[in-house]
Amino acid sequence: MSNAIESLGSLWGPLLVLGQIGLFTLVLLLSIAFLLLLDRKVWAGVMMRKGPNVVGPFGLLQSFADFGKFLLKEIVIPAGANKAVFILAPILTCTLAFVTWAAIPVAPGTATGTSWVIANLNVGVLYLFAISSLGVYGIIMGGWASNSKYPFLGALRSAAQMVSYEVSIGFVIVTVILLVGSMNLTTIVNNQDGGIQNWHVFSFQYFPLIVVMVPMFVIFFISALAETNRPPFDLPEAESELVAGYQVEYGSTPYLLFMLGEYLNIVLMCAMMTILFLGGWHGPISLGPELTANLPPLLLSLSGLAWFMGKVLFCFFLFALVKAIVPRYRYDQLMRLGWKIFLPTSLAAVIIVAGYVTFVGGLS
């Protein structure tokens, strides 16, 4: 009997992790379905159209109808394509997009200093860098395996674009790491407790670094648009030039996986903006330790989750708005912006923040 109890106890940990992964995946998929609808509604609203409004009340079930349509379509593989790589590319892209979310904390835990996260890594930022940098391989594989010039050109554009703007994003994140002194994402969020004035985008607790951190937030937002191939930086899948870029030959479920991976990365960037700059799950007004000590921990966790989701939704709305109102950049303008403006600016910010931490932060 004791052996059976011990074996059940040893299985409880892995089962709990699997349950967390399953719940997280389900919530992500449902979130993507409705965020995709929001994206289309914003685009339609700017053009003074109604957008999807037929399937379900207010068009809420449109994404699920599209999902069913993709699943029922036949998978067509071009005659000259490398079949194995052609199928593997969207699977790799979607899998990497899901795996990255394992280190994202979404709400405070019931115990002090903990959070709702699958893997609370001390090197969470490094983990995100490592996984997200692999995403370009799925796009290159898909473009090359299609055996067509338009997908291949789109894949090459994507590789150059993602590498260019990953450098700027990296330097921006380094400024936050220098301020906090940790690469743990939960620690980064907890460092912004105390109200909106302590959010890193304003950094009043590190005055006068507001003149540095506000531009860093703007650079991160614009670089995130380029990193996720969103307009006005959708050069890899430019419809007017490359038909649909690396996705030209894809349809049915493989195309659905590419699109799912793209939107997962977009929401990931929104979550990163929330964690690094917008206070994570902390509200704009601090309740104070006296009041929070008397509130149920679960209520604090749920309110933190609501704040986190609201901020992510706001960031996604900005992504959708930019898509609807900003025209596409030329490729040379895209490269010039990344290498000649964002890179030196973010590098200068790293030097300024490092100097502040060394000479001011160290003395306080």
From Swiss-Prot:
InterPro entries recorded: NADH_UbQ_OxRdtase_su1/FPO, NADH_UbQ_OxRdtase_su1_CS
GO BP: any one term: aerobic respiration
Ranges that cross the membrane: 15-35, 84-104, 123-143, 169-189, 206-226, 257-277, 302-322, 341-361
Localization of this protein: Cell inner membrane
Hydrolase found in the keyword field: no
GO cellular component: plasma membrane
Lipid bilayer topology: Multi-pass membrane protein
Reaction catalysis annotation: a quinone + NADH + 5 H(+)(in) = a quinol + NAD(+) + 4 H(+)(out)
Keywords: Cell inner membrane, Cell membrane, Membrane, NAD, Quinone, Translocase, Transmembrane, Transmembrane helix, Ubiquinone
EC numbers on record: 7.1.1.-
Pfam families named among the record's database cross-references: NADHdh
Function field: NDH-1 shuttles electrons from NADH, via FMN and iron-sulfur (Fe-S) centers, to quinones in the respiratory chain. The immediate electron acceptor for the enzyme in this species is believed to be ubiquinone. Couples the redox reaction to proton translocation (for every two electrons transferred, four hydrogen ions are translocated across the cytoplasmic membrane), and thus conserves the redox energy in a proton gradient. This subunit may bind ubiquinone.
HAMAP family: NDH1_NuoH (MF_01350)
Family: Belongs to the complex I subunit 1 family.
Subunit structure, as described in the record: NDH-1 is composed of 14 different subunits. Subunits NuoA, H, J, K, L, M, N constitute the membrane sector of the complex.
Protein name (record): NADH-quinone oxidoreductase subunit H
Organism this protein belongs to: Hyphomonas neptunium (strain ATCC 15444)
Organismal lineage: Bacteria, Pseudomonadati, Pseudomonadota, Alphaproteobacteria, Hyphomonadales
